């Protein structure tokens, strides 16, 4: 999955030590809770060497898990997850929406009001539904039950760009991934297309192409469109993150570094 997940180049990896790059296989079950535990353990180790570490991302949910903590959720039977995936493949996102509305109407209304884009996010919706079905309890009943303390103080920097510029860069990035061999990469993964790790943008659209549900051109356009939607959701998420200083992506790096240096001296 090197191309589809945009693994850093050898030059980038050589510039500084990296962690959690290609450290899991598609066959492993891995949750945001697992990431929280592993990331905090790694940070404890790294802070013994240097009291400044850099986390770059990425998924807002995973970033929040490290910075703020993540509620405990019980393990879900893989059979339940497989059944939900199968029904989603047949019935689409509306199945997940209806299930969440039935099983946890309180949380459905909260998401609908505060972050409606999430209702169109298959991965998040599958998680909500599997927790409800697997535990017999509403997803919302597991949220906010724990208080978390961190032994570090984060400095949060956000980069933003004009929407037209951002969308053009996304389109160019997809074209580059195609030229670098994304289609061939997805083809090798096709026998495992049912796995949860492959239900992501860039893979599921090309699986539809290999299933002869769409043309290649349409699949590529869908990747671009879904990536743009994902970027929009992420910006909405990060804009809600407290104490974030935002810079235009074209800002001179010196200005950003100066800002960070001032905060480090406090």
Could you tell me what each predicted segment is?
Residues 1-266:
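Phosphate/pyrophosphate-binding catalytic cores of soluble transferases and nucleic-acid-acting enzymes
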